[in-house]
């Protein structure tokens, strides 16, 4: 080693020396992908080249390399691993270990998750479970600390996460700052609780959540240091936020589907300020369509330039979250690589995660993490009479479901009555909805009406109810609603479908009432059966279960329901 005068010398790591030697070709590389091309996301070129890998790092391109392990990928294209920049793993209905096994083969090598679903149920215990899991997965799972638990004062959650409970996690190696700051009114109006969290995380990444926020109010929100946004549902909204310095995370989940609406902004010019995310996506949709690869295929088929969408899937995403070691196929960059047939079809035939070939043998090396929250459903039993809605004067507020959106409209109808009770109006597709507190805190029970499910009979119930995850049930029959809600207690959480007094479909989600203990293949198959049971009730929604799950979310406009009652989100108040 050369001695540089005046500079303290430290021993070089053998890994660093190996990377240099293998990159220069003085030593055979640990692994070489031979005969293919890689997609250069800087120049937009497809470059014919070997790709040399040392450990977890690409060390050589644009050359002819020898390797201890050589893989022929002739005719294939290599792209950087995909980064899902905002998701709730709980919405996949499987544990982080099963999510890893389910999604990594599709080329998603990094996932930036907000575990605020389990955090709303279990608090710090839920965060710790995710961090412990992230240390064991093959995929690089990064965790943002849930910023709004509970999301609002308008619902009952199972736990809270004040700043004092977040600070011990702040410097964990898997933590990337503060998760989506949903309480944007609290930011704008300088709520002391919000201010304490924002102050504590200045200089770290703070994720945004500000649907439809615009003008001076948006300026104030961004002045707090918030930089990313996944709630844009129109190109105009996204452009305003890009102009004001935000990175837009284009979302395509199982319910929230914004990809087509945002395609006008997915251009080479704007791609440095774009990334991709799924937010909430279940195993059935992943199996049938894919994950981020589905978004890439769909965008290109609709006319988006490949360079723009592949940048958004990797290098631009990495830069948005300060992950400086990944996102390109280039020397010195992390060997998160996806081998595909064509840019257009984006079908992964091989995936490398940190230089490791992804296969069953690799997944078998992971250490298991014990599940938590196996007794979290503590709701009181309910009767059909608990779902009655007394007659009131004038029109009744009704949530209007928009297919493919989690935004619900605030509609008002003069509903039919039966004696002193307001009843469903099937002619106008209006049925009952209820939220039942399930954390054992107060036994709250609120009833209302929702339009747009298409149900003609029966009931659907869920313990997945964003964000506090109380029981949410929709239905035509009060008897079926009661049976569905009570069955959730028997199976320790999940989804239940009831038709004419009998359970026709269910899935148990005993981990905090949110996730299954079964392999994702079993969950996928069970969801397929559940969908059939829901469709038999007449629902016209492609994904009725996650649609139910978003009805209680009082941070998304315009009308929602919590265990405390109907919520006018625009006024941020109970009706």
From Swiss-Prot:
Matches recorded under InterPro entries: Adenine_deam, Adenine_deam_C, Amidohydro-rel, Metal-dep_hydrolase_composite, Metal_Hydrolase
UniProt KW Cell membrane keyword: no
Cofactors demanded by this protein: Mn(2+)
The keyword Methyltransferase appears for this protein: no
The entry's keywords: Hydrolase, Manganese
Enzyme Commission code(s) on record: 3.5.4.2
GO molecular function, one term: adenine deaminase activity
Pfam families: Adenine_deam_C, Amidohydro_1
Reactions catalysed, as given in the entry: adenine + H2O + H(+) = hypoxanthine + NH4(+)
GO biological process: adenine catabolic process
UniProt cross-references to PANTHER family, sorted A to Z: ADENINE DEAMINASE, N-ACETYLGLUCOSAMINE-6-PHOSPHATE DEACETYLASE
Cross-referenced NCBIfam families: ade
HAMAP family documented for this protein: Adenine_deamin (MF_01518)
Annotated family: Belongs to the metallo-dependent hydrolases superfamily. Adenine deaminase family.
Stated name of the protein: Adenine deaminase 1
